[in-house]
Each structure stands twice: as structure tokens, then as C-alpha cells.
Amino acid sequence: MPSKKDTTPKFHKLHVKTGDTVQVIAGKDKGKVGEVIKALPQLSKVIVKGVNIKTKHVKPQQEGESGRIVTQEAPIHSSNVMLYSTKQNVASRVCYTFTAEGKKVRKLKKTGEILDN
């Protein structure tokens, strides 16, 4: 009997969360720094404020209304961003450590700065 294809969505572990400050390390916006607006774990992508801006031409919806050109951020792959320390202005990889209370937190490898409070 053939097995059914698994149609449940896969969630990938992302190293960034909504609200993190990141630096783009690859692509046309390389070097730009911005805040993560939204994380999309099913696609392994993130939306970063001010990065990967796309223009969309919107048709008029009602009679008498004129069309518009809307600019908005498009998702970029999470592997193309790196966490950024605003205190020391440096991008760093992330590692996971435990606090004295036993809570698992994210820590920047270069600076030792703890991200999760």
C-alpha cells in the first residue's frame, strides 16, 4: 500500500525573531541594517524593514479613483541575514546558552551580548 505524502507544513528553526536587528550579508542590499518586521518559518524567510523594497502598481478600485504605486518590503531568506549588535556595531553569529536560572537564551558569539531577556 503506497504511503500518503505528508502535507503538513514544515516549520524551520530560525535564528532570528521578530524585533531583532539584523544585517544583510548577501544580495543587492548587502550591508544594510534593519529590524525584522515579520518571520516566516514555513518559508525560512524574514521581512526586514527598509530592505528588499519592491514596487507594486495598484489599479483603481472605484470609479474616479486613480491608480497608485505602492512600495513594500519583500521577504528575504533567513540565511542571508546575520544578527547585529547595535551597541558595538558588529554582525555576529548566534549561539545558545543557559542563564543561572536555567533559561535558554540567545547570545552573540563575537560580543557575548545576550539577546533574550
Curated annotation (Swiss-Prot):
Record carries keyword Nucleotide-binding: no
SUPFAM superfamilies: Translation proteins SH3-like domain (SSF50104)
GO molecular function: rRNA binding; structural constituent of ribosome
Oligomer status and interactors: Part of the 50S ribosomal subunit.
PANTHER family in alphabetical order: MITOCHONDRIAL RIBOSOMAL PROTEIN L24 (PTHR12903)
Function: One of two assembly initiator proteins, it binds directly to the 5'-end of the 23S rRNA, where it nucleates assembly of the 50S subunit. One of the proteins that surrounds the polypeptide exit tunnel on the outside of the subunit.
Protein name listed in UniProt: Large ribosomal subunit protein uL24
Organism: Trichormus variabilis (strain ATCC 29413 / PCC 7937)
